[in-house]
């Protein structure tokens, strides 16, 4: 297995910390006035979605997990797990709510997602980076709202809530960045 050191750590890099495959979500290189440089990072476990902090010093090495991705179709929530179907073999795979974590707020029937496998087992899933979704609820506009440049909350068909400009109305379809949970544009 390949290894990475302190200088290779950056956002979205995958590594194994204490037998757990993780993804770095935040990092900061620190060079104190005295002593050696180090890296403070926040990593998210692929196994349970938990985020934890770790300090990495020069000389520390991490293995890179052998992770594979497969496109699968979201089917439904059975009350205990989310069910997905392999598009090639039609095999169904269930993932717990904990394994799906933040991606679950973007699930809608038939959506194609990337299933993440580690050592042959499905461990997590990620939604498409950009999606087109219908707004099911948002407050009405009042005179003068559009000139302020501020935003209002909008509930999407999946249940996710994003901040949108005032010109966007209930019933509109918008493009959303699912990674940052941000409005991108209104779909014509």
From Swiss-Prot:
Name which cysteines form disulfide bonds: none
Q: Does the keyword Cytoplasm apply?
A: yes
Q: Name one GO biological process term.
A: peptide biosynthetic process
Q: Which GO terms describe its molecular function?
A: translation elongation factor activity
The pathway entry for this protein reads as: Protein biosynthesis; polypeptide chain elongation
Query: What Gene3D superfamilies would the database entry show?
Result: 2.30.30.30, Nucleic acid-binding proteins
- Annotated coiled-coil positions are none
Q: What is a single Pfam family found in this protein's UniProt entry?
A: EFP_N
Keyword Cytoplasm listed? The answer is yes
Matches recorded under InterPro entries: Elong-fact-P_C, NA-bd_OB-fold, Rib_uL2_dom2, Transl_elong_fac_P/YeiP, Transl_elong_KOW-like, Transl_elong_P/YeiP_cen, Transl_elong_P/YeiP_CS, Transl_elongation_fac_P
Keyword terms, alphabetized: Cytoplasm, Elongation factor, Protein biosynthesis
Query: Where is the protein found, in the record's own terms?
Result: Cytoplasm
Primary location recorded for the protein, binned into one broad class: cytoplasm
Looking at the record's lineage, which domain of life comes first? Bacteria
What CDD domains does its record include? S1_EF-P_repeat_1, S1_EF-P_repeat_2
Q: Which GO terms describe its cellular component?
A: cytoplasm
Q: Which family does it belong to?
A: Belongs to the elongation factor P family.
Q: Kindly give the PANTHER family that the UniProt entry links to this protein.
A: ELONGATION FACTOR P (PTHR30053), ELONGATION FACTOR P (EF-P) FAMILY PROTEIN (PTHR30053:SF12)
In terms of HAMAP family, this protein maps to: EF_P (MF_00141)
State the protein's purpose: Involved in peptide bond synthesis. Stimulates efficient translation and peptide-bond synthesis on native or reconstituted 70S ribosomes in vitro. Probably functions indirectly by altering the affinity of the ribosome for aminoacyl-tRNA, thus increasing their reactivity as acceptors for peptidyl transferase.
What is the protein named?
Answer: Elongation factor P
């Amino acid at each position: 297995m390949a290894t990475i050191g302190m200088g290779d750590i950056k956002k979205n890099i995958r590594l194994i910390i204490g037998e757990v495959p993780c993804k770095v979500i935040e990092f900061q290189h620190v060079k104190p006035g005295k002593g050696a440089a180090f890296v403070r990072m926040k990593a998210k476990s692929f196994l349970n979605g938990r985020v934890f902090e770790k300090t990495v010093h020069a000389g520390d090495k991490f293995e890179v997990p052998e992770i594979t991705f497969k496109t699968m179709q979201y089917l439904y929530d059975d009350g205990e797990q989310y069910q997905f179907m392999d598009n090639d073999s039609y095999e169904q795979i269930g993932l717990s709510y904990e394994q799906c974590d933040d991606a679950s707020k973007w699930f809608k029937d038939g959506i194609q997602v990337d299933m993440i496998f580690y050592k042959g087992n499905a461990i997590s899933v990620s939604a498409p980076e950009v999606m087109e979704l219908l707004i099911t609820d948002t407050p009405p506009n009042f005179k003068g709202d559009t000139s302020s440049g501020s935003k209002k909350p909008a509930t999407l068909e999946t249940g996710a809530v994003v901040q949108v400009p005032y010109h966007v109305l209930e019933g509109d379809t918008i493009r959303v960045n699912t990674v940052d949970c941000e409005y991108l544009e209104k779909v014509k």
